[in-house]
C-alpha cells in the first residue's frame, strides 16, 4: 500500500470502486501482489517450510524405513526337547513430536520458551516418542522342514499409558509448526519477551542461535554430457549420478565414455559400472540386460532408422561386442571383472545380475524385472553422448542453476537423523542379542539409548560439522553458523544465504561467476569479496525452495492420459513420440505432447498438481521433463494469456484482483469492512493468475519485464512524438509471444542489496561492497535487545528511516528497525582533512547525539562441578586463602561474588568472583602455604574496555548449578578514526571534527554534519549517491519519502524539476561561506541530506601499543594480539627492508634486545652450551672438556638458543665459536 491517501477515497464510496475491474494492471499495482506474497510467506519461508516438511513427513519415513528388527534364535539341538526356535521382533510405529520441553535437574519437566532457552543456555528442543511393538514367535524345528513361526506374545511398551517410547530430542526451528511462537499473537510475543519482528528460521542450541546455511549441490538423476580435453583418450563422456528418491543419500555414478579422439578409427563406447574394475563395452551390457540382437540394441540407442551418421558411429561398438552373443556369457563377462575373485560361474553370473539390478541406474528401480527400462535409459544416455559427439548438441553446462539443488534444514537434518537412527537400531539389536544369549529380560529402557540422537543432532548443530562426531574430519564444516545479530538486515540476509562446498582455494573461476540462469533466483550483488566470492550466494527476495512432493500421482495421471509405458515402446513405429521423464526417470512416451503439456499446466494452475512442480517441454529434443524433487529454487511470475476480447496477449491479473488484495490488506491493518472476503497470495495462485517457475522451466518460456511491455506496439507509436525528457527511455518490444511477466524487476535483488537506493545507477562492485557493509551498520537489531544477553550488541541512539527509500524496505522492516541516520552532507574540499576517503564531521552535531551508540557486552560464568563433592563457588575471593588472584581490583564485588548493576567498571576489574577448592595434597608451584584452600577462577572485564554494569542475571543451568550472565554497557561517541559509509560502498573514516562555527555554512545558515571529498565520486561512478542526495533534499523539503527503488520511471530530470519548484538550484548546488573567514567559497557546493551508516569498526577497539608485557613460555618472545597485550611483530619483510637499508644495529635492537635477548656461556673447545656457571663465585666449567678457562659469554636470542637445543635433540650438533676462541 504505497499510497493510503489515494486508496482512502475509493473506500468511501465502494471497496471495489476501481475504474474498471478488468482493466490491465500497472507496475504500481504489482506492489500489492508483492505485499500479499510477503504477508503470506515471510522472508524465511524456505527455512520454515523445509523444517516443517521434515517433521511432518520425512521423520516418519525414516522411522518406517528400518522399522523392524528381527532376531532369530535357532534351536541348539543339545537335547531332544531343545528343538524350539524363537524369533524376536521389534517394530517401530508412529512417531510423535512434543512441544519444546526442558527436563530440570530435580526431575520436573516443563514447557520451554525460546527466551528462557537463550538466557539459560539451554537447547530449544522437543521430545521424540515412538510406538514400539515387541513380538515373540516360536516354531518347532524339525530337520529338513521349513520353520513355521507362530505368534506367542505381543506387547506394546507400557512405560507410558500409550506405549510410546522416548528415543531422543529434536532441536526445533523457531516459528515452525512445532514452536510455541508459530501461533502466538503480537501481545503473546510481548509477554514471552520476544520481538514481533524476529522471523524465526533458526535453532537455539545451548543458548546460542544457529542457522543452517543452504548447501548447494549438483542435482542427481540427470544425464550430462561433457567433452574431455585433448590428452585424454576419451573424447566425450555422458554421466549420471543416481540418487534414490527416498532413502539414503547413496549415490552410484554411471559413466558412458566415447573412446578415441575425432578422426581416429574404431571409436568404441564403453561404460563404467559400479564395483566393476574395467570399462565394459555397451553392447555387452545390453546383452546382459537381455537385449540380444544387434538391430534391437541399435534401436534402443538410435530412434531414427535413417540416421546413418549415428548408426555409423555405433558400428565399432557392435563389432566390439560381437564375440558375446547371449545373456549368460555377457553376465559372466561382467562378473569376471568384478571385485570378488575366484568364485564359481553361477556365483559370478548372480553377482553380475545383482550389480545390474541394485547398483546400475538404481534411481529407476532396484527391483528385478525392469531390465528393459534400464536398457532404454542406457540407450538414451548413449544417444545423448553421440548427439554431442556429432556436434548436433552442445555439451552440458555444469553451472546451469536448474541443474543444481539446495539442501536446506529438512534434507540436512534428514541425512543426519537417518545416520543416528541407524546407529540407535544397531545398538538395540546388539542389546537384543545380549539379552537372548544371557537369557535376561528385555528392558526397553536399557535398550534405547536416547542420548545417541539427542547429542548427535546437538553436536552437528553446535559445531557445524555435519556428520557423526567420530568422523569429524570427513564431514562438511560450517553448515550451521551462529546467527548474525549485528543489525536486522544482517540477520535476514544470513537466513537466506547459500553455500557451495567447493575448496575455497580452487583457482576455478566458472563456479564463482554469475550465470544467466541465476536471474531472479540469486542476488547479483550480494556475495562476499575475497576467497568465498561467488561461492557464497544469497537468495533473491521472492525466491523459494521446493520441499519435494510425491511423484506417484503424476505418474499415475500420465499413464491415464495416454503415456505409453517404456516397455511397450517401439522406436521405429512412433519416431515422433516425445520421451516423458519424471525426476530423471524415463517412464514412457507420448504421441501428443502439446495437449498433454496444456493439461498438466491447467492442472497445476488449478492447484490439482502441487504448484512447486516444474514441467519443461523441450520441443526440439522431443522431451517432456517433470521435476517434483526437493531443493529446486523457484520464483513466482504473472501468467500472460491470449485475451480474445482484446486480440492480443494480456496479463491474467486485473485491477479487480488488485482491489481485492488491497481490501484484504486494509482489513488487516485498519480492521476495515466486515464483509471483505479474504483474498491472499494463495488465492492468486489457485486462480491461476501467478505461477512458480524454476530455473529449468524458465528456459522454455518468454518473460516480459513490465506489464506495460505487453501493450501492442501500435498503441505506443503515437506517444513517441512528444518525448518527455524527464521520462525514462523504454525498450521497444516487437515480441508477441510472451507467456509470463515479471512481477517486478527489482525482485532480482536480495536482502542487503534491496536497501540500496537506485542500485541501477551504480557500478556493480559498489553494490557488492555496500551489501557487505550494510551488515556491519549499527541500528536496532531487535526491539527486545534490552531483555537479551547477547555476547555483543551495538545500538544506535537515534536511528532514522532514510529519506530515500526503496519499496522493498517495507518487507525488510527497514523503516521500523533502521540502521543509520540522514546526515546533511556537503561534497567539498575544505581544509584538506578529508583526503583519501576520510571525512570532516561536525563536532556540535556529535555533541547533540549524531551517530552515538550503545555497546553491550555480556560475560557468562557458571559453577562447574568436578566429581561428586568438589564444586566451584561464586564469592568474593580473599587474598588470605586464595591462590593465583588476578591483578584487577576485587573491591567492586558484593559478597556473593557478583557486581551490582550501575557500578562503573574499567579494564581488568573483576566482575564475577569465583573460586575452586584445591585438594590438600596438590602442590602449587611453590606459592602454596598452609592457609591456601582455594584457587581463583574469576572473570575480569576485558582489559581494553570500560563501562557500566547494565544487568546481572542469576539463574541455574540444566544441571541445577548456579549460572550468571553480566552485561556491561558503554557509550561509543564518534571520534577521529571511526568508520562510516553511505549506502553506495563509499566508506570513510573521520579525519577531523570541527565545531559548527568552523564549518562552512549556506546562505540560510545551514551547516553540514559531514563533508566528504569530491574525489570520492568520479572514479567510483556511484552516481546513485548523488541522486540519493538530490532526492533526499526534495523529500526533506516536501515532507514525503522519496522513492529510490530501482528500475522505475524516476529520473534525475524529474527530481531536479521538483527541487527547482521548492526554490533551490535544480542540481542541488548551493553557495557556501568559509567557516573560518566568512568569505564566499569560490565553487558552488553540492549539498543535501544523505543516509549514512555507522560501521562497527571503531578506533577505540583497535588502538594498541605495548612496551613491556607478557611473554610466550616456549620462545620467551612477546605474545601476539591486542587482547593479550601482545607485541607488534617485526616480520620478515620488515627485516628485509632493514637489511636493504644496511641498518645493522637497529636490526639487532629490534630482533634481539627488544624481543628475547638471552645470555649463555659456551665452551671454547667443544663450542656447546654445556658450561656450568656459578656466577656469584665467578666459577665456570665445561665438564665434558674438563675446561675451566676457555669459556665465553655470548648474547643470542632465546629462540636461537631453543633452536640449537632442538637440533641437538635431533642429533645435529651446532657448535658456537667466537673470534677469540678460534685464535685460542
Curated annotation (Swiss-Prot):
A zinc finger (C4-type) spans 1163-1185. Its EC number is 2.7.7.6. It catalyses: RNA(n) + a ribonucleoside 5'-triphosphate = RNA(n+1) + diphosphate. It is an enzyme of class 2 (transferase). It comes from the Eukaryota. Its main location: nucleus. InterPro entries: DNA-dir_RNA_pol_su2 (IPR015712), DNA-dir_RNAP_su2_dom (IPR007120), DNA-dir_RNAP_su2_hyb_sf (IPR037033), RNA_pol_bsu_CS (IPR007121), RNA_pol_bsu_protrusion (IPR007644), RNA_pol_Rpb2_2 (IPR007642), RNA_pol_Rpb2_2_sf (IPR037034), RNA_pol_Rpb2_3 (IPR007645). NCBIfam families: PRK09606.1 (NF007175). Component of the RNA polymerase II (Pol II) complex consisting of 12 subunits. PANTHER family: DNA-DIRECTED RNA POLYMERASE I SUBUNIT 2. This is DNA-directed RNA polymerase II subunit RPB2. It comes from Saccharomyces cerevisiae (strain ATCC 204508 / S288c). The lineage of its organism: Eukaryota, Fungi, Dikarya, Ascomycota, Saccharomycotina.
Amino acid at each position: 500500500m504505497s499510497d493510503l491517501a489515494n486508496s482512502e477515497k475509493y473506500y468511501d464510496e465502494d471497496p471495489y470502486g476501481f475504474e474498471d475491474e478488468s482493466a490491465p494492471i500497472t507496475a504500481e499495482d504489482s506492489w500489492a501482489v508483492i505485499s500479499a506474497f510477503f504477508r503470506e510467506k515471510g522472508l524465511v519461508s524456505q527455512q520454515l517450510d523445509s523444517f516443517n516438511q521434515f517433521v511432518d513427513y520425512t521423520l516418519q519415513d525414516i522411522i518406517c524405513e528400518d522399522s523392524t528388527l528381527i532376531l532369530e534364535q535357532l534351536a541348539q539341538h543339545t537335547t531332544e526337547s531343545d528343538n524350539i526356535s524363537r524369533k524376536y521382533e521389534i517394530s517401530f510405529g508412529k512417531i510423535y513430536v512434543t512441544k519444546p520441553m526442558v527436563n530440570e535437574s530435580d526431575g520436573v519437566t516443563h514447557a520451554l520458551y525460546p527466551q528462557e532457552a537463550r538466557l539459560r543456555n539451554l537447547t530449544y528442543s522437543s521430545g521424540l516418542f515412538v510406538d514400539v511393538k515387541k513380538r515373540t514367535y516360536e516354531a518347532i524345528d524339525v530337520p529338513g522342514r521349513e520353520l513355521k513361526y507362530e505368534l506367542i506374545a505381543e506387547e506394546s511398551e507400557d512405560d507410558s499409558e500409550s506405549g510410546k517410547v522416548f528415543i531422543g530430542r529434536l532441536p526445533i526451528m523457531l516459528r515452525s509448526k512445532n514452536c510455541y511462537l508459530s501461533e502466538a499473537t503480537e501481545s503473546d510475543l510481548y509477554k514471552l519477551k520476544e520481538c514481533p519482528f524476529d522471523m524465526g528460521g533458526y535453532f537455539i542450541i545451548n543458548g546460542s542461535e544457529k542457522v543452517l546455511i543452504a548447501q548447494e549441490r549438483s542435482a542427481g538423476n540427470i544425464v550430462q554430457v561433457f567433452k574431455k580435453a585433448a590428452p585424454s583418450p576419451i573424447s566425450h563422456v555422458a554421466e549420471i549420478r543416481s540418487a534414490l528418491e527416498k532413502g539414503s543419500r547413496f549415490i552410484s555414478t554411471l559413466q558412458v565414455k566415447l573412446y578415441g579422439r575425432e578422426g581416429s578409427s574404431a571409436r568404441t563406447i564403453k561404460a563404467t559400472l559400479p564395483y566393476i574394475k574395467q570399462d565394459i563395452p555397451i553392447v555387452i551390457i545390453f546383452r546382459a540386460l537381455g537385449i540380444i540382437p544387434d538391430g534391437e540394441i541399435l534401436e534402443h540407442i538410435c530412434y531414427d532408422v535413417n540416421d546413418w551418421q549415428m548408426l555409423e558411429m555405433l558400428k565399432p561398438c557392435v563389432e566390439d561386442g560381437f564375440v558375446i552373443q547371449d545373456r549368460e556369457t555377457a553376465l559372466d563377462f561382467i562378473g569376471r571383472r568384478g571385485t570378488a575373485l575366484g568364485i564359481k560361474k553361477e556365483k559370478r553370473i548372480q553377482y553380475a545380475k545383482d550389480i545390474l539390478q541394485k547398483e546400475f541406474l538404481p534411481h529407476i528401480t532396484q527391483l528385478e524385472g525392469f531390465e528393459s527400462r534400464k536398457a532404454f535409459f542406457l540407450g538414451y544416455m548413449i544417444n545423448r553422448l553421440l548427439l554431442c559427439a556429432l556436434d548436433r548438441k552442445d555439451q552440458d553446462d555444469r553451472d546451469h542453476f536448474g541443474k543444481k539443488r539446495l539442501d536446506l534444514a529438512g534434507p540436512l537434518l534428514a541425512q543426519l537423523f537417518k545416520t543416528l537412527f541407524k546407529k540407535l537400531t544397531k545398538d538395540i539389536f546388539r542389546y537384543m542379542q545380549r539379552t537372548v544369549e544371557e537369557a535376561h529380560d528385555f528392558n526397553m529402557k536399557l535398550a534405547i539409548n536416547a542420548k545417541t540422537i539427542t547429542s548427535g543432532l546437538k553436536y552437528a548443530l553446535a559445531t557445524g560439522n555435519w556428520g557423526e562426531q567420530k568422523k569429524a574430519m570427513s564431514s562438511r564444516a560450517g553448515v550451521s553458523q551462529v546467527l548474525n545479530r549485528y543489525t536486522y538486515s544482517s540477520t535476514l540476509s544470513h537466513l537466506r544465504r547459500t553455500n557451495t562446498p567447493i575448496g575455497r582455494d580452487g583457482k576455478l573461476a566458472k563456479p564463482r561467476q554469475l550465470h544467466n540462469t541465476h536471474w531472479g533466483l540469486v542476488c547479483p550483488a550480494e556475495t562476499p569479496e575475497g576467497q568465498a566470492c561467488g561461492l557464497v550466494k544469497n537468495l533473491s527476495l521472492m525466491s523459494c525452495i521446493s520441499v519435494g512432493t510425491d511423484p506417484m500421482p503424476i505418474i499415475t495421471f500420465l499413464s491415464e492420459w495416454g503415456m505409453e509405458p517404456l516397455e511397450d515402446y517401439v522406436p521405429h513405429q512412433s519416431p515422433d513420440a516425445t520421451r516423458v521423464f519424471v525426476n530423471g526417470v524415463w517412464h514412457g512416451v507420448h504421441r501428443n505432447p502439446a495437449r498433454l503439456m496444456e493439461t498438466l499446466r491447467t492442472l497445476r494452475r488449478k492447484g490439482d498438481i502441487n504448484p512447486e512442480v516444474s514441467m519443461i517441454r523441450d520441443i526440439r529434443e522431443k522431451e517432456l521433463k517433470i521435476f517434483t524433487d526437493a531443493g529446486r529454487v523457484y520464483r513466482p511470475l504473472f501468467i500472460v494469456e491470449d485475451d480474445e476480447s482484446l486480440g492480443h496477449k494480456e496479463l491474467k491479473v486485473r485491477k479487480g484482483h488488485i482491489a481485492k488484495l488491497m481490501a484484504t490488506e486494509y482489513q488487516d491493518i485498519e480492521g476495515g469492512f466486515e464483509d471483505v472476503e479474504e483474498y491472499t497470495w494463495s488465492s492468486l495462485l489457485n486462480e491461476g493468475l501467478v505461477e512458480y517457475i524454476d530455473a529449468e522451466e524458465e528456459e522454455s518460456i518468454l518473460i516480459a519485464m513490465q506489464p506495460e511491455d505487453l501493450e501492442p506496439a501500435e498503441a505506443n507509436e503515437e506517444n513517441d512524438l512528444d518525448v518527455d525528457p524527464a521520462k525514462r527511455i523504454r525498450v521497444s518490444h516487437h515480441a508477441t509471444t510472451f507467456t509470463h511477466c515479471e512481477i517486478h524487476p527489482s525482485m532480482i535483488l536480495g536482502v542487503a542489496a534491496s536497501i540500496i537506493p537506485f542500485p541501477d545507477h551504480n557500478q556493480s562492485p559498489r553494490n557488492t561492497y555496500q551489501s557487505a557493509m550494510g551488515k556491519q551498520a549499527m541500528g536496532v537489531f531487535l526491539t527486545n535487545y534490552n531483555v537479551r544477553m547477547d555476547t555483543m550488541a551495538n545500538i544506535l541512539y537515534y536511528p532514522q528511516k532514510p529519506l530515500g527509500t526503496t519499496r522493498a524496505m517495507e518487507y525488510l522492516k527497514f523503516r521500523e528497525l533502521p540502521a543509520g541516520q540522514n546526515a546533511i552532507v556537503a561534497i567539498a574540499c575544505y581544509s584538506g582533512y578529508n583526503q583519501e576517503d576520510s571525512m570532516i564531521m561536525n563536532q556540535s552535531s556529535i555533541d547533540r547525539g549524531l551517530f552515538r551508540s550503545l555497546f553491550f557486552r555480556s560475560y557468562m560464568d557458571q559453577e562447574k562441578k568436578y566429581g561428586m563433592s568438589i564444586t566451584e563457588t561464586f564469592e568474593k575471593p580473599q587474598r588470605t586463602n586464595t591462590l593465583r588472584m588476578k591483578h584487577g581490583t576485587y573491591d567492586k564485588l558484593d559478597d556473593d561474588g557478583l557486581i551490582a548493576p550501575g557500578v562503573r567498571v574499567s579494564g581488568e576489574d573483576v566482575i564475577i568472583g569465583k573460586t575452586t577448592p584445591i585438594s590438600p595434597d596438590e602442590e602449587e608451584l611453590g606459592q602454596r602455604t598452609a592457609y591456601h584452600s582455594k584457587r581463583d577462577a574469576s572473570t575480569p572485564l576485558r582489559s581494553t574496555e570500560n563501562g557500566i554494569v547494565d544487568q546481572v542475571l542469576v539463574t541455574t543451568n540444566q544441571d541445577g548449578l548456579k549460572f550468571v550472565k553480566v552485561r556491561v554497557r558503554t557509550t561509543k561517541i564518534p571520534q577521529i578514526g571511526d568508520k562510516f559509509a553511505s549506502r553506495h560502498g563509499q566508506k570513510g573514516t573521520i579525519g577531523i571534527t570541527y565545531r559548527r562555527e568552523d564549518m562552512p555554512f549556506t546562505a540560510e545558515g545551514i551547516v553540514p554534519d559531514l563533508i566528504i571529498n569530491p574525489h570520492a565520486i568520479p572514479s567510483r561512478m556511484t552516481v546513485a549517491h548523488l541522486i540519493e542526495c538530490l532526492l533526499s533534499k526534495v523529500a526533506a523539503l516536501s515532507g514525503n519519502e522519496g522513492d529510490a527503488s530501482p528500475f522505475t520511471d524516476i529520473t534525475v530530470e524529474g527530481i531536479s524539476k521538483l527541487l527547482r519548484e521548492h526554490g533551490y538550484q535544480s542540481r542541488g548546488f548551493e553557495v557556501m561561506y568559509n567557516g573560518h573567514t566568512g568569505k564566499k567559497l569560490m565553487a558552488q557546493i553540492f549539498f543535501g541530506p544523505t543516509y549514512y551508516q555507522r560501521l562497527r569498526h571503531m578506533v577505540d577497539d583497535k588502538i594498541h601499543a605495548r612496551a613491556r608485557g607478557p611473554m610466550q613460555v616456549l620462545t620467551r618472545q612477546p605474545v601476539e594480539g591486542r587482547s593479550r597485550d601482545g607485541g607488534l611483530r617485526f616480520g620478515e619483510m620488515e627485516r628485509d627492508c632493514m637489511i636493504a637499508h644496511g641498518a645493522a644495529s637497529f636490526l639487532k635492537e629490534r630482533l634481539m634486545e627488544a624481543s628475547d635477548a638471552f645470555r649463555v656461556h659456551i665452551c671454547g673447545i667443544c663450542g656447546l652450551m654445556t658450561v656450568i656457571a656459578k656466577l656469584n663465585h665467578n666459577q665456570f666449567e665445561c665438564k665434558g672438556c674438563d675446561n675451566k678457562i676457555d669459556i665465553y659469554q655470548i648474547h643470542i636470542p632465546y629462540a636461537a638458543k631453543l633452536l640449537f637445543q632442538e637440533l641437538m635433540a635431533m642429533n645435529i650438533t651446532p657448535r658456537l665459536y667466537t673470534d677469540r676462541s678460534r685464535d685460542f
